[in-house]
């Protein structure tokens, strides 16, 4: 059995175009705001907003400005927590809302990393709008599952997997031929999620999750061609922490009894 080239082509991300990430321009420095009425606390809230932009120039200015604040950040954090308590009347809200207050360097590192990941995503998709538009693979899965009744009160995939398998089997470009195809498809979905996450996306669409789950289920049904392919599946299951999934015992049995030479 050969790899499904139509499947591979559909489940491939756009190539990297470094010049396409220019839509992430340096923003203006956020304007200071009166939030709590406490000048020092409000100053830190403003500096945190500057840091969250993820742009090095604004971060450098914020970190330099923070040196002029003489009150310990821990004390300012307590004052901010007290403000939140007065506003919301909830000690839990106050505790969580003031958590990490004033930890500008840590926040800066996180913001820079998030911005780096955004650049990577936009180097493939050009704009945030394109990034969140249905990819050709998503559109194909959505079309294939049109009319399939969804199951209520399901935590993850809310399609019945038998119907999903029947629908995808009718579309050669959605059906993996080999275990390597299955891994390719799952890698596509995981990478797409990874590219979208820095922009604050939620869960994958149900039709995308259905195909990811279908590829995983097919790992138990397609015979391995070689020892190397079996090992690749084992490594994949360990890497994605899928050993506890319902299909995993059948997958392991398939890898052992597959008859590869």
Predicted segments, located by residue:
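Sequence/structural signature of long amphipathic alpha-helices
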Residues: 1-261
């Amino acid at each position: 059995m050969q790899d499904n080239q139509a499947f591979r082509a559909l489940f491939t991300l756009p190539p990297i175009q470094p010049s396409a990430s220019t839509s992430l321009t340096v923003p203006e420095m956020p304007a200071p705001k009166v939030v709590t009425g406490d000048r020092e606390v409000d100053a830190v809230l403003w500096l945190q907003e500057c840091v969250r932009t993820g742009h090095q120039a604004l971060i450098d200015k914020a970190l330099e400005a923070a040196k002029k604040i003489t009150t310990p950040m821990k004390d300012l954090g307590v004052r901010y927590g007290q403000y939140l308590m007065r506003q919301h009347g909830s000690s839990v809200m106050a505790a969580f809302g003031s958590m990490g207050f004033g930890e500008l360097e840590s926040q800066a590192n996180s913001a820079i990393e998030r911005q780096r990941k955004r650049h990577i995503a936009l180097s493939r998709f050009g704009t945030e709008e394109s990034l969140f538009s249905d990819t050709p693979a998503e559109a194909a899965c959505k079309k294939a599952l049109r009319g399939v009744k969804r199951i209520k009160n399901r935590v993850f995939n809310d399609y019945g997997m038998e119907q999903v398998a029947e629908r995808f089997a009718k579309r050669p470009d959605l059906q993996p031929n080999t275990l390597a195809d299955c891994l390719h498809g799952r890698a596509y979905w995981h990478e797409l999620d990874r590219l979208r996450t820095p922009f604050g996306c939620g869960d994958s669409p149900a039709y995308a999750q259905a195909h990811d789950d279908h590829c995983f289920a097919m790992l138990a049904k397609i015979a391995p061609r070689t020892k190397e392919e079996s090992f690749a599946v084992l490594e994949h299951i360990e890497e994605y922490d899928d050993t506890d999934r319902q299909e995993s015992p059948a997958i392991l049995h398939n890898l052992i009894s597959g008859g590869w030479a």
